[in-house]
A protein has these predicted regions:
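Histidine/acidic-residue-rich catalytic or RNA/ligand-binding cores of hydrolases
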Residues: 169-186, 191
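Histidine-centered catalytic micro-motifs
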Residues: 54-71, 161-166
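Conserved small/polar residues in nucleotide/adenosyl-binding loops
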Residues: 199-204
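A glycine-rich, hydrophobic loop/mini-helix early in the fold
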Residues: 64-102
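Glycine- and Gly-Pro-enriched alpha-helical subdomains that act as flexible
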Residues: 93-133
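Generic N-terminal segment detector
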Residues: 1-47, 157
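Divalent metal-coordination and catalytic microenvironments
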Residues: 19, 63, 92, 120, ...
Length: 206
């Protein structure tokens, strides 16, 4: 059985692109998050209705972060107007490898040009590694702080990317920040490897 829903005149003039990864039980999760759980409470065979119970952290799969996720006293998702999620979109390709950093210079030189009011998607290529893996989370590229300043100064509407977060993993709880600071990070082995890489690079520069 298949269903179709007709589009109105306004929607029929637009192109829609689904950028979401599949979501459900077993979706890749941050190292300290519980798995998504989907339970069937009623099924067609027994109850003639389908009722499901979903237990999840909202910060899972392809999602939007509200400012309140990281900055105290800022808006939650329900406090942001719907108009903030619609507008002109631009996808820029800025390939990065393991622990790469997206900088303001990268954004300034990106094509097509990023304009004020754009919703910007930065494609680092890391979506190809999306999985329940140490590589996707621990070795991910991230944005340098000057990139955030560049976005703000440019006046973009929203920013999306294909990495585990906008932040570099070594600026998250994977490293000694936040909930796992006293443990040396959620993934201390990754922190040790990163520190060794920095030490080796510094020694090579001398």
């Amino acid at each position: 059985m298949s269903f179709t829903w007709p589009l109105g005149n306004a929607e029929s003039q637009l192109e829609f692109y689904d950028l979401s990864h599949p979501w459900g039980h077993g979706v890749p999760a941050w190292p300290y998050f519980e798995d998504v759980k989907v339970e069937r409470l009623h099924g067609m065979a027994k109850s003639r209705v389908l009722t499901q119970k979903i237990t999840t952290v909202m910060h899972s799969g392809t999602h939007i972060d509200a400012p309140a996720h990281v900055v105290e006293g800022t808006p939650f998702l329900d406090e942001i107007p719907l108009s903030a999620f619609f507008g002109t979109g631009v996808v820029v390709s800025i390939p990065k490898n393991k622990w790469g950093v997206v900088t303001a210079e990268d954004l300034e030189n990106a094509t097509p040009e990023i304009r004020p009011g754009d919703i910007v998607i930065v494609n680092t290529g890391w979506h190809r590694k999306y999985a329940d893996s140490a590589e996707y989370y621990a070795y991910s590229p991230g944005f340098y702080k000057d990139a955030g300043g560049w976005f703000a100064a440019k006046g973009v509407k929203a920013v999306g990317t294909d990495t585990q977060a906008l932040d570099h993993p070594m600026a998250t709880a994977i490293a000694p920040h936040g909930p796992a600071e006293h443990l040396g990070g959620m993934l201390p082995w990754a922190v040790k490897e990163y520190d060794c890489l920095l030490y080796t690079s510094d020694a090579a520069d001398e």
